[in-house]
């Protein structure tokens, strides 16, 4: 594939739609010169969510380990030291969150599309997102608040982490 034709997958999550941020989010990608190739609004089922987030067999282990590390970095005790047990809880919360309303699925194309989109989106942990990123500018949630409430973090958007993942 030609470098200028690199594609990436982006999904605006239910909270982004609920807050009417669709146009703002799309504009951010257009302003850097990316081309919108496909767009579709769908309502995800819990099964769709599980398929989407767990295609990589390492995802469950890595997610659990990152979650445990996040607790420890904050001086908190994780609810479990078993990464797979932690991920099961994360996935259950994610299924509820992602199937609570419609999502917008998009494919964007352009040079270095994956890296550019990841920079524009910001860190998955909203409090770590830089000002100027989508999450840094519009998300008021945090891992700590979502953990306290027993729910998934509301971070507006999903973006593929690699060309392989985007495919």
Label each region the model flagged.
Residues 1-167:
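Non-catalytic terminal and connector segments of soluble metabolic enzymes
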């Amino acid at each position: 594939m030609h470098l200028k034709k690199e594609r990436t997958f982006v999904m605006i999550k239910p909270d982004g739609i609920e807050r009417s941020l669709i146009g703002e989010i799309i504009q951010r990608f257009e302003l850097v010169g990316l081309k919108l190739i496909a767009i579709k609004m769908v309502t995800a089922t819990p099964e769709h969510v599980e398929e989407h987030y767990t295609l990589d067999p390492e995802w469950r282990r890595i997610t659990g380990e990152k979650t445990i590390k996040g607790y420890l970095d904050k001086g908190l005790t994780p609810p479990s030291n078993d990464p797979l047990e932690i991920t099961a809880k994360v996935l259950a919360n994610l299924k509820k969150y992602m199937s609570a309303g419609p999502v917008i699925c998009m494919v964007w194309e352009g040079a270095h599309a994956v890296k550019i989109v990841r920079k524009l989106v910001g860190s998955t942990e909203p409090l770590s997102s830089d000002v100027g990123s989508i999450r840094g500018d519009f998300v008021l949630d945090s891992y700590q608040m979502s953990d306290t409430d027993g729910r998934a973090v509301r971070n507006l958007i999903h973006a593929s982490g690699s060309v392989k993942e985007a495919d």
